């Protein structure tokens, strides 16, 4: 079951060279092919048939425990093979340029963080019968498709050329059609990416609908509650993204605003809601689900604060994104809002001048980015954020303990995962960067706050 472009190309005779009979458009497509559709890593290579897809799947909880990411990848592979076949039957060009790219992007995935959180929440809450396993894997697949929608659209909004170390979807489509007018190719790439994100969201909703239709064997009320969580998740994701781009456009970089955006865009969507979905599908009591939601919000905020630090200080080879993207795009991150607030509080004019000259400058040089790093360190913002990450992570683990989860081994796995997502990645220090020492505040200036604003504690309570 491989993606093929044979249906839209001239078929060469044995005595013809490759490409014979190609139209100019087909020649361009041959030079810039769309990605092939392969099985997930470790699944044995490209799809060869439905039997391979069936063999990858298991509704045995122990099998999923051993490789959550692999099980979710197999579920996605089967689901996406069907979706792409449907798209190909509808129109081969649409399938090749849009549907296959959505499938390829989703299957390559990232850390499969949301599926892992959902799964270990389900298991820690005592879930694990076959109906629950199937529902959890479908819900996890839907979360990954929702993430595809978010990332593909995000790259268009940010004009980001790279995602996960590869050309972003809109950039890849533009390159495929790039021998025409550059502006036309760029516009086509952006339009295709918007449609690709829409398609990913539609496929995610289809997957949840199928889950609910087969939900008779789930605990009483689980399907209804899962649907409510799903509806909330979608809206929170969009709201968080809007706060992000609106703050970027209007330069509203207050600390409270940054916390609110981080809560909606990352804490809820990335961590809290997957944990809640797992608890709901397991039939957990409402009190247990609430405790896990609190844990997820704390860990999710820590996750976003870590991401802010990584954008500025981590090795691009680790993150898969150019360093300093948030600064160049003028994103209203917590880290930059806190840096500015501390500079204002201490009367540090030099720091404010550096920030004013750098934030939102797409052409910011490496030297300019180093000056921003120096200011973030010198104001104490970097250390303050690291301290808050540690406190939020500890609070998240306490909430897991307070949930009194019935499965100790799965609960331990969940605690380990929550600790992992907010911890530093390898290569956290930017190569060659030597941070400056913090200067003494001017005489009479207000001392910087000893901790981050109350807003973090309020949303993470």
Region spans (language model):
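Hydrophobic alpha-helix feature that most strongly marks membrane-spanning transmembrane helices
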Residues: 297, 304, 314-317, 340-344, ...
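Hydrophobic, well-ordered secondary-structure elements that form the walls
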Residues: 336, 396, 414
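Mobile late-domain/C-terminal helix-loop "cap" segments
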Residues: 350-403
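Charged, amphipathic alpha-helical oligomerization/scaffolding segments
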Residues: 67, 71-78, 82, 229-232, ...
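Mg2+-dependent prenyl diphosphate-binding active-site environment of isoprenoid biosynthetic enzymes
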Residues: 92-348
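Conserved N-terminal diphosphate/IPP-binding helix and adjacent helical/loop segment
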Residues: 1-143, 148, 152, 157-180, ...
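A glycine-biased, small/acidic residue-tolerant capping/turn segment at secondary-structure junctions
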Residues: 306-319, 349-356, 408-412, 429-433
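Short, charged, amphipathic alpha-helical segments
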Residues: 224, 228, 293, 387, ...
């Amino acid at each position: 079951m491989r993606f093929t472009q044979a249906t839209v190309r001239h078929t060469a005779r044995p005595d013809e060279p490759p490409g014979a009979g190609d139209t100019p458009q087909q020649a361009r497509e041959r030079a810039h092919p769309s990605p092939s559709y392969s099985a997930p890593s470790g699944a044995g290579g490209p799809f060869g048939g439905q039997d391979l897809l069936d063999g990858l799947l298991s509704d045995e909880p122990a099998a999923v425990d051993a490789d959550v990411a692999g099980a979710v990848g197999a579920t996605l592979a089967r689901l996406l093979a069907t979706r792409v076949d449907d798209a190909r039957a509808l129109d081969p060009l649409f399938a090749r340029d849009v549907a296959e790219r959505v499938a390829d992007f989703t299957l390559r995935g990232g850390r499969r963080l949301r599926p892992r959180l959902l799964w270990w929440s389900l298991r820690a809450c005592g879930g694990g019968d076959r109906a629950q396993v199937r529902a959890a894997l479908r819900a996890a697949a839907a979360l990954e498709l929702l993430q595809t929608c978010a990332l593909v659209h995000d790259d268009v909004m940010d004009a980001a050329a790279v995602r996960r170390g590869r050309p972003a979807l809109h950039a890849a489509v533009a390159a495929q059609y790039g021998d025409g007018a550059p502006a036309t190719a760029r516009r086509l790439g952006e339009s295709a990416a918007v449609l690709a994100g829409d398609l990913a969201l539609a496929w995610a909703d289809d997957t949840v609908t199928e889950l609910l239709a087969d939900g008779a064997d789930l605990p009483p009320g689980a399907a209804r509650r899962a649907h409510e969580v799903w509806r909330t998740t979608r809206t929170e994701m969009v709201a968080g993204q809007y706060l992000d781009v609106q703050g970027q456009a209007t330069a509203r970089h207050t600390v409270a605003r940054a916390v609110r955006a981080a809560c909606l865009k990352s804490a809820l969507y990335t961590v809290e809601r997957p944990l809640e979905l797992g608890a709901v599908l397991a039939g957990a009591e409402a009190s247990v689900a609430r405790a896990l939601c609190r844990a997820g919000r704390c860990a999710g905020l820590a996750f976003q604060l870590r991401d802010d630090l990584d954008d500025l200080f981590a090795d691009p080879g680790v993150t898969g994104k150019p360093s300093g993207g948030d600064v160049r795009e003028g994103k209203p991150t917590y880290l930059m809002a806190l840096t500015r607030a501390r500079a204002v509080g201490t009367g540090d004019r030099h720091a404010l001048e550096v920030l004013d000259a750098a934030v939102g400058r797409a052409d910011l040089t490496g030297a300019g980015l180093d000056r921003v790093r120096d200011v973030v360190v010198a104001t104490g913002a970097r250390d303050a954020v690291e301290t808050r990450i540690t406190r939020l992570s500890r609070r998240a683990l306490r909430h897991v303990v307070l949930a009194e989860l019935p499965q100790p081994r799965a609960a331990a796995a969940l605690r380990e995962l929550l600790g992992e997502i907010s911890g530093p990645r390898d290569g956290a220090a930017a190569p060659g960067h030597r941070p400056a020492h913090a200067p003494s505040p001017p005489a009479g200036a207000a001392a910087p706050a000893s901790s981050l604003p109350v807003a973090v504690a309020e949303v993470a309570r």
